[in-house]
Amino acid sequence: MYYGFDVGGTKIEFGAFNEKLERVATERVPTPTEDYQLLLDTIAGLVKKYDNEFSCEGKIGLGLPGMEDADDGTMLVVNVPASTGKPLRKDLEALIGRSVKIENDANCFALSEAWDDELKDEPSVAGLILGTGFGGGLVYEGKVFSGRNHVAGELGHMRLPLDAWFHLGDNAPLLGCGCGKKGCLDSYLSGRGFELIYEHYFGEKKKAIEIIQAYNEGESKAAEHVDRFMELLAICFANLFTGLDPHVVALGGGLSNFELIYEEMPKRIPKYLLSVAKCPKIIKAKHGDSGGVRGAAFLNIK
């Protein structure tokens, strides 16, 4: 049995999956964001409950909006401050008495998609999230590739490529990022970035859904903005694809529901790739909000 925990700033979602990777149990509980011992006890309590229910010792995986220090095992999780600076994995292993795997939630999203029936035979899958922020995860041969420092999928903190600056023109917005730097992809390719770029060029604050609705109604400013954003997205995706060369790319997050992306990217990306390279297949993620808990559980698939 595979146990997955999607640990967020408000709730912990638990899922149990059998050997056929079918979900057989679900539970949601509030996240103890400020009390570390209560956080440990909450996770351990769910493990014990479902061990008893299924008469087994499930394999445990956690996905969190943060990362584990590769050297000392301490966590950096902004939305769950109780765990920041603490060796969460080691403490859980000591409390539960078995191995625990921890990954960034974007990597779990990518892993969930990579183990979908239609993608599980693909050698490599990139999962890219166009949500409140922009991030991603890399899966090679069915396993998350997180790198030496566990930051291999932190694509949102790569900077805009030169072609993107030229495309945005002399009046290009220099947007700050929560990491403290400027020019991160997170600030441009996210739903938030979609809105900020519109505001920069037109001096109006609008929600992404309002801009897209205006585009669908043929409004000229929205059309100009969407064309600018699609080209920006193509440039940045091509830059990422040149380095990662994934076989398939699955898009998640709110902005991934903008169907025009799937029409425009295959047409716009190729001119920014090497002449021998082809644009990978780009699809909408299938598993939505359940991707985090699925991917966390699947961290233990051999």
Curated annotation (Swiss-Prot):
Species of the source: Vibrio atlanticus (strain LGP32)
Pfam family of the protein (one): ROK
UniProt keyword list: ATP-binding, Carbohydrate metabolism, Kinase, Metal-binding, Nucleotide-binding, Transferase, Zinc
Function of the molecule: Catalyzes the phosphorylation of N-acetyl-D-glucosamine (GlcNAc) derived from cell-wall degradation, yielding GlcNAc-6-P.
Family stated for the protein in its record: Belongs to the ROK (NagC/XylR) family. NagK subfamily.
Gene Ontology molecular functions: ATP binding; N-acetylglucosamine kinase activity; zinc ion binding
Annotated CDD domains: ASKHA_NBD_ROK_NAGK
Catalytic activity: N-acetyl-D-glucosamine + ATP = N-acetyl-D-glucosamine 6-phosphate + ADP + H(+)
List of residues binding Zn(2+): 157, 177, 179, 184
Sites where the protein binds ATP: 4-11, 133-140
Protein name as catalogued: N-acetyl-D-glucosamine kinase
Pathway: Cell wall biogenesis; peptidoglycan recycling
Gene Ontology biological-process entries: N-acetylglucosamine metabolic process; peptidoglycan turnover
EC number in record: 2.7.1.59
